[in-house]
Design a protein with these regions (language model features):
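Surface-exposed extracellular loop regions of Gram-negative outer-membrane beta-barrel proteins
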Residues: 305, 311-316, 513, 556-567, ...
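Gram-negative outer-membrane beta-barrel transporters
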Residues: 656-658, 681-790, 900-904
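Signature of Gram-negative outer-membrane beta-barrel scaffolds
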Residues: 441, 467-594, 727
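C-terminal beta-signal and adjacent terminal beta-strands/loops
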Residues: 659, 711, 779-801, 809, ...
Length: 905
């Protein structure tokens, strides 16, 4: 019986295989008429996929009948074609031409210019860089139109997206996020990107909760020729020059690409004092040994230095306006910023690729080294020199007991005339010191990291309708972390000494006098090994597709202190090896009702190790680990309806996600009662065991009203809330061992993940004479500030002076003080337009984008301060409506523009 069953199954498979027709075709560039490599060719019913090779060729196996073929490639307009498959065993289709999508290219350029460096910890880590290449209408709106208000799809963090360059993971050990600035200014060479949205499948990685971005850097994929471009802007930088040459695939099997760019803003752009000084260089060479074997070497280097902007209190905004930046001051006619971010981390990737039919093998070796620095003014035994320090603001005198309104008015006038950092005073103070000791210096917090990565990825069909993909990644990461004396500001030396605790920062050294370039304050190393293995199976049926995938993740981390800081007895030497392991799974099902109507369902379980910053009590000064470290766990599911009509494309998605065991670490000074004996101090705070729920809807649609007119719309309706009361763990110089402090009452508060609602409608006109213009109107709402955990513990109602509960508590007033602030809704109008010409063999394109056309002033995010984290102090601080320690806000850009001219030879 079993033999007969096996025979009939084999016969059925043979009949099915026999009835298939081998369909071959080519895809070319509509303008250059040259073949396009990497074009995705897809049939929805039955489910079939192919990708064009270096000669633009593709092959599909299809039965007889009429089918709808979809052609898509990043940077080109997605097209579709109805084909009729005859009875022949082999059928050749006419060449199919794709036209460049200049609107998408312009949007990508504008997005990159505005956001490629907005990755500071204090900001919302806009995910636009992760979304810019998407063909999806909703994702493109999220990247271009919503990103200026720090919108995040589904409220996910950028650490939830896996970013890879030629198979090498780019997410960092410290915080789990990719550093997009490492390839900033190299748009031409990194534009070939493949995205998996959310928990959908990927051919190269298991992916994160928010998906994956795979950047393909292969010279054979780039358009051959020489391309020059120049940009003017008033956003992050004022000018940019770029040149890229791609040889294309030559007869000897070689292809290479060279690219370089320069971006600059001497004294800032939209915000004064935000220096921007960046270069970028890249080289890639590819050798195709034959039709199956390929070698590829890539080098990327994008050094940059840029000035930061400060989050502002409402008082500072009211006095100085939305473009105020206290970090800079005049120094001999230049606007010098005290807080700069300096990045210099080259990347090298060597790859071997094998492909024969549907079998693919990728072996990649990656090495990245260099450093990231963040400068700041440090001072020993002196007062904070920042012009907006709370004691220099009018509110300081208003909020005293008794209030001094006359002094507040005098201080207001003084502040208005002295609102910027006074470099001359700092130099004078240091030079006038009797022994030459600097009271003020510019310090640089340095992270010097070296990462070696090996990646192996293998994909092959195991049966006619079953495809297997597996991958293995090993990373060895070594990082040195320390503070560096960057500038003595006219003095002769700086003491490596903690005047607050009356202790040296390193008692192992005899000479505590530090010169420029010396380490001070803290110094430690982190050594880590990361192993990640994943496997994925895809099952393709006539009208359906199913995938299942699993990932195993191993991470170990060990801290080694180089300084002995007496306040922390375990600051020096090697600490314990912390090992974290986790297994994650996901699955998806896609069903084609017809070739134009699809239903898709995905579900996943993630078990992910905590980032390094969330496992130590105080990583700068101590080897001590937090107790009961648990992996972050997430459960998620989504359902999608996808519509692809000739004149209407749409996606509707519903999703729900629960995230558990999340941790958040912050450092600040507080006047809250920490213990029975300690009423204030500089605190390292970790909120542990946070549980969040994210659910909502996403909808994006695009309608071709006329051959030249397109209407688009996008809607995001989300709700992101805390669903438990996690634990608070704190340590300070007075509590170096750390203590489990209290429960934080966060339940039902909103997670501060950017706007939770977004609406967009747009029109695009595309002339047959190769010019186009588009406009979008966007509304972003339900954006909440980050919460102070200390404000929401039982200690909030404890008087730090008496250690007893405050008397005469007005609980209605307390609820008002603790109400989470919802920022004002934001309405923005954006315009993008362009024109292209072809003069003989020269192609010219011009683009202009204007964001926030009506110059709307808005706040893009904010956070509560924890300085006055008790009822009495907060009540006093808010008594006159101008709190000294009120919420701090990140200010959005006003009207900005970018103009770009590109010439391709």
């Amino acid at each position: 019986m079993l033999k007969k069953l096996f025979f009939y199954v084999l016969l059925l498979c043979s009949i099915t295989a026999f009835s298939q027709v081998k369909v071959e075709g080519t895809v070319i560039d509509e303008i250059t008429k040259k073949p396009l490599q990497g074009v995705k060719v897809r049939v929805n019913s039955p489910r079939r996929y192919a990708e064009t090779d270096s000669k633009g060729r593709y092959v599909l196996q299809l039965p007889q009948g009429d089918f709808l073929l979809f052609f898509s490639l990043n940077g080109y307009t997605t097209r579709e074609e109805v084909v009729m498959i005859e009875k022949e065993r082999r059928q050749l289709l006419d060449p199919y031409a794709l036209s460049p999508d200049y609107a998408q290219e312009a949007e990508q350029l504008a997005v990159i210019s505005e956001n490629e460096l907005e990755d500071d910890e204090s900001q919302a880590d806009a995910m636009s860089g992760l979304l810019q290449s998407s063909q999806d209408v909703f994702m493109r709106r999220a990247a271009f139109d919503f990103s200026s208000v720090f919108f995040k799809p589904r409220g996910y963090d950028s650490k939830d997206v896996s970013v890879l360059i030629n198979g090498i993971p780019m997410n960092r050990l410290e915080n789990g996020r990719a550093q997009w600035a490492n390839w900033g200014g190299l748009n031409d060479i990194t534009r070939n990107q493949e995205l998996s949205n959310g928990i959908a499948k990927s051919d190269y990685t298991f992916g994160g909760l928010a998906g994956s971005t795979y950047i393909h850097i292969r010279p054979s994929l780039n358009r051959p020729g020489l391309r020059f471009s120049s940009s003017l802007s008033n956003r992050s930088y004022v000018g940019r020059l770029m040149a890229t040459y791609s040889s294309g695939l030559q007869r000897n099997g070689l292809a290479y690409t060279l690219s370089a760019s320069r971006r600059w803003a001497a004294n800032g752009s939209w915000v004064d004092g935000t220096l921007y000084n960046a270069y970028a260089f890249s080289g890639a060479i590819e050798y195709q040994l034959n039709n199956y074997h390929n070698f590829n070497l890539v080098g990327l280097f994008s050094p940059i230095k840029r000035g930061k902007t400060s989050p502002l209190t409402r008082e500072a905004i009211d006095l100085m306006g939305y473009r105020y930046n206290p970090y800079w001051g005049d120094q001999q006619g230049d606007k010098r910023n005290s807080r700069n971010r300096i990045i210099s981390e080259p990347i090298f990737v060597l790859s071997y690729n094998y492909q024969k039919d549907d079998t693919r093998l990728n072996v990649d070796l990656g090495y990245q080294f260099g450093e990231i620095g963040n400068t700041r003014i440090s001072y020993g035994n002196a007062q904070n020199p920042e012009p907006n320090y709370y004691k220099k603001m009018p509110s300081y005198y208003l909020n005293q007991q008794p209030s001094d309104e006359a002094m507040a008015e005098l201080q207001k006038n003084y502040f208005l005339n002295n609102s910027q950092l006074n470099w001359a005073d700092l130099y004078a103070a240091n030079r006038n010191a009797t022994d030459g000791r600097s009271a003020f210096i510019v310090s640089n917090d340095v992270n010097r990291e070296r990462t070696f990565t090996t990646n192996v990825n293998f994909s092959t069909p195991v049966y006619e309708n079953i495809k297997s993909t597996s991958g293995l990644v090993y990373r060895r990461i070594t990082s040195d972390n320390y503070a560096l004396v960057d500038d003595l500001l006219g003095g002769n030396y700086f003491m490596n000494y903690d005047y607050f605790e009356s202790q040296p920062y390193n008692s192992l050294e005899a000479d505590r006098k530090k010169q420029q370039g010396d380490k001070w304050n803290y110094s430690y190393a982190l050594n880590s090994n990361v192993v990640e293995a994943f496997s994925q199976l895809e099952f393709t049926f006539k009208k359906a597709e199913v995938f299942v995938a699993a990932r195993y993740h191993y991470t170990d981390v060990q801290r080694e202190g180089n300084f002995y800081y007496p306040v922390y007895p375990d600051s020096y030497g090697k600490g314990a090896l912390q090992v974290q392991k986790g297994m994650s799974t996901k699955a998806g099902f896609t069903y084609a009702l017809t070739g134009r109507h699809l239903l898709q369902f995905n579900t996943a379980y993630f078990n992910t190790p905590q980032s390094v910053r969330n496992i130590f009590v105080n990583v700068r000064n101590s080897n001590r680990l937090l107790p009961n470290i648990k992996n972050e766990v997430a459960y998620t599911a989504d359902a999608n309806y996808i519509l692809r009509l000739p004149y209407l494309k749409s996606r509707l998605t519903g999703y729900i996600t629960e995230i558990e065991n999340t941790s958040e670490t912050n450092f600040f000074y507080t006047e809250t009662a920490l213990t029975d004996e300690i009423s204030n101090g500089f605190v390292a705070q970790t909120i542990d065991g946070i549980k969040k729920r994210h659910f909502g809807l996403e909808w994006g649609a695009e309608a071709q009203l006329l051959p030249t007119l397109k209407l688009s719309a996008a809607v995001a309706l989300g709700q992101y809330t805390y669903v438990n009361n996690p634990k608070l763990y704190i340590s300070s110089d007075d509590i170096p061992q750390g203590i489990a402090y209290d429960e934080v009452k966060l339940k039902n508060y909103h997670v501060p993940s950017g706007p939770q609602q977004a609406y967009s409608v747009g029109l695009e006109y595309r002339s047959n004479n190769y010019w186009w213009v588009s406009a979008t109107a966007n509304l972003l709402a339900k954006n909440y500030v980050s919460l102070s955990a200390l404000n929401r513990t039982s200690q909030f109602f404890i008087d730090p002076n008496t250690r007893q509960s405050f008397t005469n508590i007005d609980y209605d007033k307390a609820r008002q003080l603790l109400k989470q602030e919802r920022l004002d809704d934001v309405f923005l109008v954006n315009l993008v337009g362009g024109k292209s010409w072809r003069v003989k063999k020269v192609y010219i394109s011009a683009m202009l984008s204007i964001n926030n056309l009506f110059d709307t002033q808005f706040l893009s995010g904010g956070f509560e301060q924890s300085r006055t984290a008790n009822y009495g102090k907060m009540l006093q601080d808010n008594a006159h409506g101008v709190p000294s320690f009120g919420n701090r806000y990140f200010v959005g850009y006003g009207r900005t523009y970018m103009a770009n001219l590109a010439i391709s030879l």
